Amino acid sequence: ACPGPNPGRP
């Protein structure tokens, strides 16, 4: 999960 504006991304 990536932090920031796209937490839903791996």
From Swiss-Prot:
<keyword id="KW-0382">Hypotensive agent</keyword>
<keyword id="KW-0964">Secreted</keyword>
<protein>
    <recommendedName>
        <fullName>Angiotensin-converting enzyme inhibitory peptide</fullName>
    </recommendedName>
</protein>
<dbReference type="GO" id="GO:0042151">
    <property type="term" value="C:nematocyst"/>
</dbReference>
<dbReference type="GO" id="GO:0005576">
    <property type="term" value="C:extracellular region"/>
</dbReference>
<comment type="similarity">
    <text>Belongs to the bradykinin-potentiating peptide family.</text>
</comment>
<comment type="function">
    <text>Inhibits the angiotensin-converting enzyme (ACE) (IC(50)=2.03 uM). May act as an indirect hypotensive agent. In vivo, is not toxic and does not induce lesions and microscopic abnormalitie in rat liver.</text>
</comment>
<keyword id="KW-0166">Nematocyst</keyword>
<dbReference type="GO" id="GO:0008217">
    <property type="term" value="P:regulation of blood pressure"/>
</dbReference>
